[in-house]
Amino acid sequence: MTDLKASSLRALKLMDLTTLNDDDTNEKVIALCHQAKTPVGNTAAVCIYPRFIPIARKTLNEQGTPDIRIATVTNFPHGNDDIDIALAETRAAIAYGADEVDVVFPYRALIAGNEQVGFELVKACKEACAAANVLLKVIIETGELKEEALIRKASEISIKAGADFIKTSTGKVPVNATPESARIMMEVIRDMGVEKTVGFKPAGGVRSAEDAQQFLAIADELFGADWADSRHYRFGASSLLASLLKALGHGDGKSASSY
């Protein structure tokens, strides 16, 4: 197996196969769930809006893949600093049956100098998730934070507040996951000594098998080749799947999606 094939198989099994579009429908979510079951293995999860969780659960069970996890998003994509709303949305997502919640950190508040609201928001959502055995991923929106110091600070705050994963991006802003921001965030995980309990998720802009290989190489460099399993690493993507399958000898590499 070539290096690209090996990394592509790894990446496929780490994917949160995603559709977060305004025109999402039950039919599109059903199709996404079907795509998550591939000839070479299943993706780690699907990531969808909360209202589609019941139809996704039904579809995943019916196709014999109940182990594919269901992730959803809250405080999304705006990352406002209203803790009550973020918490209410997170509780609603849990009530819908989410296995994982990806909440957007109040990044604009941090840019304006407010570190406390981000900590409190993540902490509140973590308490709700922990009570229901739901994983919490925190989206810090690196492409808007821009500066290394802010990316580092948002990562640190999220981890201190209880994040199970730190995630680069919503996929809804001009700049999403980059190798540079990925390295900064994983270095924070390393520097804080939390690599056993905190994972990393690049999202948006990871579109090709070669992209995925590059992102995995950073994780392998920092933590060794065994770290990036589905408890410690995910890719938030949709168009990536077709490229990975093509690298693995399945399909033509074409995808209808841009995430």
From Swiss-Prot:
What chemistry does it catalyse, as a reaction equation?
2-deoxy-D-ribose 5-phosphate = D-glyceraldehyde 3-phosphate + acetaldehyde
Q: Where is the active site?
A: 102, 167, 201
Under the heading Gene3D superfamilies, the entry gives: Aldolase class I
* Keyword vocabulary terms for this entry: Cytoplasm, Lyase, Schiff base
**Molecular function GO terms recorded:** deoxyribose-phosphate aldolase activity
The record's EC number reads: 4.1.2.4
Instruction: Supply one GO CC term from the record.
Output: cytoplasm
Q: In which pathway does it act?
A: Carbohydrate degradation; 2-deoxy-D-ribose 1-phosphate degradation; D-glyceraldehyde 3-phosphate and acetaldehyde from 2-deoxy-alpha-D-ribose 1-phosphate: step 2/2
Ranges annotated as spanning the membrane: none
The family database entries (Pfam families) matched by this protein are listed as: DeoC
**Location in the cell:** Cytoplasm
Q: What is its main location?
A: cytoplasm
* InterPro entries referenced in this protein's UniProt entry, alphabetically: Aldolase_TIM, DeoC, DeoC/FbaB/LacD_aldolase, DeoC_typeII
What HAMAP family does the record tag this protein with?
DeoC_type2 (MF_00592)
Q: Which PANTHER family match?
A: DEOXYRIBOSE-PHOSPHATE ALDOLASE
Q: What does this protein do?
A: Catalyzes a reversible aldol reaction between acetaldehyde and D-glyceraldehyde 3-phosphate to generate 2-deoxy-D-ribose 5-phosphate.
UniProt protein name? Deoxyribose-phosphate aldolase
Supply the source organism for this entry: Klebsiella pneumoniae (strain 342)
